[in-house]
């Protein structure tokens, strides 16, 4: 089933809202389970100052999104662009089944693509 980290972070994340004054937003969906996630980023001097999200997601996506958010606030966007699946595994302290890998990185992927949109670099990351 789910470890304690996933169970805790899947309940009522306080960063579930549409930020009013954001610099970039981005939407992604997981085509395996149809989770939908939209992130809102406030970026100043290439530092993530705030991150919020709205979603229609399962427990894994919600929990990984919230724990991911906690870890990237005040990080440089270039550093955030280097993070991938292994980073999520470190955060949740557990491997994720193949069936749930896309769910575990949906917030990360959506954030990376929001940053690419912010940078206007033409890059689109995929699962």
Language-model-derived ranges and their functions:
Residues 30, 35-45:
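Short beta-strand elements
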């Amino acid at each position: 089933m789910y470890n304690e980290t996933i169970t805790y972070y899947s309940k009522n994340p306080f960063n579930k809202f549409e930020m009013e004054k954001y610099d970039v937003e981005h939407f992604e969906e997981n085509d395996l389970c149809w989770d939908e996630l939209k992130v809102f980023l406030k970026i100043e001097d290439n530092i993530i100052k705030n991150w919020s999200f709205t979603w229609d997601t399962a427990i894994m996506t919600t929990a990984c999104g919230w724990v991911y958010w906690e870890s990237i606030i005040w990080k440089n966007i270039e550093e955030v662009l280097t993070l991938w699946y292994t980073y999520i595994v470190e955060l949740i302290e557990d491997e994720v089944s193949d069936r749930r890998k896309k769910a575990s990185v949906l917030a990360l992927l959506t954030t990376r693509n929001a940053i690419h949109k912010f940078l206007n670099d033409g890059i689109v990351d995929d699962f």
